[in-house]
């Protein structure tokens, strides 16, 4: 019998958060009464301009999109002040990461991943035949640069730094990112999926002084287009050239490109989304009846001790609130839950549900 590659057999399937349909079926709850605060989706949804663009673009669904999403890359170049030749687009940031690693990793290479972190980094590393090397963040989940550098060897090809980090929500300073980039020969991938919600600076300015930094972005969060799967990345010329050799052609659909272009024109909706998240995040920080870690993202992390994360998440689902159990994140244990920032109405209900769960133990 033919078997999958050994490196694939070693991969654990990605575990996503529960969706509304699953919870409704499992607990006999009306779908309309369920609030999903598990997947870090936009609490205000997509821009009306993007929704209208999707409707119009659907009429041309039979026509191939541009091979490399050039029109979107040009729009992103204008927004961020980065040359088009240094921007790539993919079917979600996951695809950008996979393409990048596919271009550079070989069997025997190593990838350094500070934990806790998004599990897909590990999966795509193993898929490419490389070995993930882990290091722990500090007790407050800040990046330990010394711990990162201790894992670096002459086989290290990539180092992942997520800022703000998922699932902990904290930023990594530009000074820390610079320290890592200057100390290694490998590529430092800075995942900035949640940077829009932070008060910190993007690592874009570091690309002017470090030619081994790649920055990943997404339109799933602040732009409210998670269902369109639109990711993009900034990278220096020498990395871009190799990336494009293995990039999937026509990776973004015409509909996704149209939605992204329209969303980028709706600055008012974007700003309203970011400001709403910041205000509601503060509401959660002040009112959730468990320890809440400081966050610069559109989610907060809570410590459910002495209750287990599984207990809290299960009891919340029974009450129609979907949260993310962080036990699926390597080294997170069984006491952390990630909560997406919702609307005020959703957040008030969430706080009431958590108080009820905590009070009934």
UniProtKB/Swiss-Prot annotation:
Keywords: Amino-acid biosynthesis, Aminotransferase, Histidine biosynthesis, Pyridoxal phosphate, Transferase. InterPro entries: Aminotrans_II_pyridoxalP_BS, Aminotransferase_I/II_large, HisP_aminotrans, PyrdxlP-dep_Trfase, PyrdxlP-dep_Trfase_major, PyrdxlP-dep_Trfase_small. Its cofactor is pyridoxal 5'-phosphate. The keyword Oxidoreductase does not apply. The keyword Ubl conjugation does not apply. It holds the Pfam family Aminotran_1_2. The modification N6-(pyridoxal phosphate)lysine is found at residue 221. It catalyses: L-histidinol phosphate + 2-oxoglutarate = 3-(imidazol-4-yl)-2-oxopropyl phosphate + L-glutamate. Pathway: Amino-acid biosynthesis; L-histidine biosynthesis; L-histidine from 5-phospho-alpha-D-ribose 1-diphosphate: step 7/9. One of its GO terms (biological process) is L-histidine biosynthetic process. It comes from the Archaea. Its EC number is 2.6.1.9. One of its GO terms (molecular function) is pyridoxal phosphate binding. Belongs to the class-II pyridoxal-phosphate-dependent aminotransferase family. Histidinol-phosphate aminotransferase subfamily. PANTHER family: HISTIDINOL-PHOSPHATE AMINOTRANSFERASE (PTHR42885:SF2), HISTIDINOL-PHOSPHATE AMINOTRANSFERASE-RELATED (PTHR42885). This is Histidinol-phosphate aminotransferase. It comes from Methanocella arvoryzae (strain DSM 22066 / NBRC 105507 / MRE50). The gene is hisC.
């Amino acid at each position: 019998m033919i078997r999958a590659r050994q490196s694939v057999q070693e991969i654990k399937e990605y575990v996503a958060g529960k969706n509304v349909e699953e919870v409704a079926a499992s607990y006999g709850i009306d779908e309309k009464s369920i609030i999903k605060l598990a997947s870090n989706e936009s609490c205000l949804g997509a821009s009306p301009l993007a929704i209208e663009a999707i409707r119009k673009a659907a009429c041309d669904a039979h026509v191939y999109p541009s091979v490399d999403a050039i029109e979107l890359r040009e729009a992103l170049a204008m927004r961020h002040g980065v040359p088009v030749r240094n921007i790539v687009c993919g079917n979600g940031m996951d695809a950008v990461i996979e393409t990048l690693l596919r271009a550079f990793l070989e069997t025997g290479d190593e990838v350094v991943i500070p934990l806790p972190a998004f599990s897909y980094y590990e999966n795509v590393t193993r898929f490419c035949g490389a070995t993930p090397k882990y290091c722990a963040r500090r007790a407050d989940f800040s990046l330990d640069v010394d711990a990162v550098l201790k894992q670096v060897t002459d086989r290290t090809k990539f180092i992942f730094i997520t800022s703000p980090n998922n699932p902990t929500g904290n930023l990594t300073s530009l000074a820390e990112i610079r320290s890592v980039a200057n100390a290694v020969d490998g590529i430092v991938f800075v995942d900035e999926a949640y940077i829009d919600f932070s008060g910190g600076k993007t690592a874009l300015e570091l690309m002017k002084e470090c030619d081994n930094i790649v920055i990943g972005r997404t339109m799933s969060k602040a732009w409210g287009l998670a269902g369109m799967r639109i990711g993009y990345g900034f990278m220096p010329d020498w990395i871009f050239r190799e990336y494009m050799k293995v990039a999937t052609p026509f990776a973004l659909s015409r509909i996704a490109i149209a939605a992204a272009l329209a969303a980028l024109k709706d600055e008012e909706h974007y700003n309203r989304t970011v400001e709403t998240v910041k205000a509601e995040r503060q509401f959660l920080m002040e009112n959730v009846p468990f320890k809440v870690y400081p966050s610069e993202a559109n989610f907060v992390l809570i410590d459910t001790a002495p209750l287990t994360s599984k207990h809290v998440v299960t009891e919340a689902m029974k009450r129609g609130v979907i949260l993310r159990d962080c036990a699926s994140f390597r080294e997170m244990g069984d006491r952390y839950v990630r909560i997406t920032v919702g609307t005020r109405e959703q957040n008030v209900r969430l706080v009431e549900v958590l108080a009820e769960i905590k009070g009934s133990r």
